[in-house]
Amino acid sequence: MRALTVLLALMAVSATSNAYYRVCYYTNWAQYRPAGAKFFPEDIDPFLCTHIIYSFAKINQQNMIAMYEWNDDKMYVRFNNLKENNPELKTLLAVGGWNHESGTESPFSRMVRTIATRKVFIDSVKR
C-alpha cells in the first residue's frame, strides 16, 4: 500500500511539474524602434513562450474593438502566423493600454454598462 501511495505521489508531481505557462508580451510599437532594434512578429521565437500577448487593441466610441496602429490588422495576421510553426502556441490580444483611459469616461465602463453595449463589443471581438 505504501509503495502505491509513493507511486501515485510521484505521478502527481511528474504530471504537474511538466505543465507550465511562459507568457510573453509583444508591443505593437516595437516596429518603430530605431534601425537595428526594430522588432516584428516574425522575430519572435514561437517555441520560447506558451502564450504571447499582442498589445494593444482599444474600445472605440461605438463599443467595438478597434486597432491602435494604422497597420494592426496586418500585424495581427503576422502575429497569428507564428502558430504555423508552433500549433500549440496561444496568441492573445490585450485591450487597453497606458492611454486608453484618458478622457472623462472609461471605454471599459461605457462598454459594460448595458447588455446591448456588451453584445456589441463581444460581436466585434468574434469577427
Predicted ranges, named:
Residues 2-19:
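Cleavable N-terminal signal peptides of Sec/SRP-targeted secreted and luminal proteins
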